[in-house]
Amino acid sequence: MKALIIDDEPLARNELTYLLNEIGGFEEINEAENVKETLEALLINQYDIIFLDVNLMDENGIELGAKIQKMKEPPAIIFATAHDQYAVQAFELNATDYILKPFGQKRIEQAVNKVRATKAKDDNSANAIVNDMSANFDQSLPVEIDDKIHMLKQQNIIGIGTHNGITTIHTTNHKYETTEPLNRYEKRLNPTYFIRIHRSYIINTKHIKEVQQWFNYTYMVILTNGVKMQVGRSFMKDFKASIGLL
């Protein structure tokens, strides 16, 4: 875990740093004495846990805690202070704990263990979601052509395009043509890997071979089977995000 200690008193920061090192299990322990240093640290690192004093030189710790909680993925906040009158406000901010100075190692360890337990639970939930998505990626997509239903493995589908009422499904070893609308297949494909890049095209991001600059500030996607599909302007933002350009 990564920890950030925010306190304007050097001795308090040093003591907390020492105690956390004694507890162990921290990849990184950093310090900040004011709001400016705090914001800079939060821009550089993604912390799991923050120890926050209430009385800072340039801002109230409760107000700073409220700002931190507005982050997309806020760290766990443990208020570490000499003042007990802010406890209610702290817990209204969903603080994990509220510890009074002087610090004791047992009390600090108790607070750290709360964060670790929550983090382990969240990690397990995230892993379950990823596993579910991976399992879904192994599922087959039923494609009806004439009097046959072809079961296509999703990982083998390179891209799907539609033109003049004909939908073409490109796979690693074949090409299938059907009159079914693109929307029908889009609903059944795993959104972790498949993305709509145009009103007429859906691609499997695992099968992108190359992306070229195209007209009107768009892109041309070349898939692993050599098929080219253009990214529509209204789909540019989602496409960039899917390949890590945003």
Swiss-Prot record:
It comes from the Bacteria. This is Transcriptional regulatory protein LytR. Homodimer; when phosphorylated. CDD domains: REC_LytTR_AlgR-like. It is found in: Cytoplasm. Residues 2-116 form the Response regulatory domain. GO terms for cellular component: cytoplasm. One of its GO terms (molecular function) is phosphorelay response regulator activity. It holds the Pfam family Response_reg.
